C-alpha cells in the first residue's frame, strides 16, 4: 500500500491517494482541483477505482463529481451524510460563495463495520459521529484516515449541520481506547500518531467526558 498526499482547495484539505500493489487507487476526500488529482494518478500510473469520503462537507467532496464523471470511480459515503451531496447549506459550501459546488451521487452508502476492498487493501469503516452524523474513519493496515474527526492536537468542530457535541465525546472515547501504533492521516494539518495524540491532544490525553465537562 502506497499513500500520496495532496493538500487542496480553499481550506487546505488533505486528499489521500491510496495505491494497491496492482496499481489500482482509492482517493480519500477529493476536496477540489480534480485535474491535480488526475495528474497525480497519471504520474503514479494508477487507475482510480473508488472515492472514499470521510464525511459530506464540501471541502472534502468538491472534486467528486468531476472525478466520477471522468473515471467511473464508485463513490462511498456514510448513509447519514447522503443528504449533503446536493445541499449547499448542509454541506456548508454556502460559506464560500466563490466556490462552484457540483452535486454528485453516492454509489455505496456506508455503515459501521463495512469492509471496502481494493485488491490486497482492506478499509474498515468506523462511524465516528460528532463533526457530522455520518463522519467515518477508514482503517487500513496501521493507518487511520480520520477526516475531521481528529487532528494533530485538536478535533473537528460540531456547530455545523448534524454536528453533535455529545456524540463527539463518545467517538473520541472510542479512539482513545485504540492501540497507540496507528498513524493518523487527518483531513487538515500534518499526520500524527495515536500515541502522540493520547499524550498531547487535550481531547484524548484526559478522560474525554471530564475534558468536555
Describe these PLM feature segments:
Residues 23, 32, 58, 81, ...:
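Short, glycine/acidic-enriched loop or turn micro-motifs at the edges of active sites
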